[in-house]
C-alpha cells in the first residue's frame, strides 16, 4: 500500500524538476531595410521579425513589432539589407563529390567508405547552409547506402550544422541501368549507384525497405538515356510511397520517360530537359512539378565553352531552354534544384536561380521556385518557404535588390536557421 503514494510523490517531484529545468526561449528581433514577402513578391519596408526560440512570432514594421518584444530582446540590426526566407534546393546530392576523369563515378564508390562520404556530406551540408539554403531535398545518395539518413538525423540533433533535409536514400533503377560505369561484369558484388530492381514485386520491396530505413521520399529512374522502369513498376512505387505519406521524384529526360513517369503518378520530374509540349501539358493537368537542374549543365559546358558549338550539344541546350520556357508558359509549377554533385558546386546552389532567369523566368519566379513552390513540393508549406508567424525562423539577407538582380543571391551575407545565426557579414549597428 505504501508503493502508490511514493510513486505519486516521485511523479510530482519529477514534474516540478522538469518545469524548473525548462530554459526560457531566446527572443530575437531582426530589423532590416526591407523584407520580401511571399508569394506576393512585394517588399515590406522597415521590416521587423520577432523570433521566439526557433519560430517566427510576429512580422511587421520594426517599430510596431518592437512594442511586442520583451525588455530582454536581442536586436539584430541588418541596416538596409534585404531579407528573404531561407532558400530551398529540391535536388541535391550532398553525399557525392564525384571527381574528374574516366570512371570517376565508379572510383568514388569503391575508394571511399560510407563513413568518409558521410563526413564529406557534413562538410558540404555546412557549405550549402552558409550559402543561404536552409532546406534541401537530397534526391539519392549515389551508393552510400543510408548514410544520408545519418546525416539528416545528425543535423536534426545538432551534432553538425546543415540545412533541414529530406532524403531519398538509395534511389531505384532497373537492372542493367545506372550501374557503375566502366566496371567489369565479373565484379558482381561491386556497389551500385542505386538499388537495382526488376518487376513490380521487386519494386514494392525496395520502396518498403527504403522507407523502413528512413527515406523521406522515393527517387525513381524513369529513364537513363532510354526509358527503363515500366509504367507498372513505377505505379507500384508511387502506390507504396503515397500509402506511407512519401512523395516520388522521377529522373526523366526523354519524352517517353517523362510520359511514363507522369502516367504512373509521380510528384515531380527531375531534369526534364527533353520534355515536349505533350509532356508538359500532362504535368500541368496532373499537378506534377518540374525541377529543371540547369546550372549543373552550365557548369559542365563552362569547363570547355567550345563544346557548346557541337551540333548535338546545341540541340540539347535548345531543347532544355524550350522545355523551361514552355513549362512556364503552360503554368507548370517549377521548383529549384541545383543537382550539385561535385565538390566545387556545393555551396554554389544560387547559380540555379540565375540559370532559370537566363531561360526566361523573372527574378521573382526564380525566387518562388526556391521558396514557396519548393516548400509545397516538400509538403512543408507550414514550416518553411516564407517569413510568416509560426514558421521556422529561417532567414537570409543580401545587399541589393534580388527582384532587379537575382545574382545578389550568390553573395548571401546573413543566414539564420531556426533562430540561430549561422553567419552575419553585416557590420554591427
Regions found by a protein language model. Name each.
Residues 78-159, 232, 256, 260-264:
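Metal-associated gating/positioning segment near the N- to mid-region
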Residues 107, 243, 316-402:
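His/Asp/Glu-enriched, well-ordered alpha-helical/loop segment
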Residues 1-11:
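Bacterial N-terminal signal peptides
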Residues 20-24, 35, 40-84, 107, ...:
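Histidine-rich, glycine-flanked metal-binding segment
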Residues 95-116, 175-192, 285-317:
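Active-site gating loops and adjacent loop-to-helix segments of metal-dependent hydrolytic enzymes
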Residues 120-146, 162-170, 213-226, 247, ...:
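Divalent metal-dependent hydrolysis catalytic cores, especially in the metallo-beta-lactamase
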Residues 99-101, 148, 228, 258-264, ...:
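Histidine/acidic-residue-rich catalytic or RNA/ligand-binding cores of hydrolases
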Residues 153-171, 228-253, 287, 291-295:
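Alpha-helix-loop-beta-strand connector modules within alpha/beta enzyme cores
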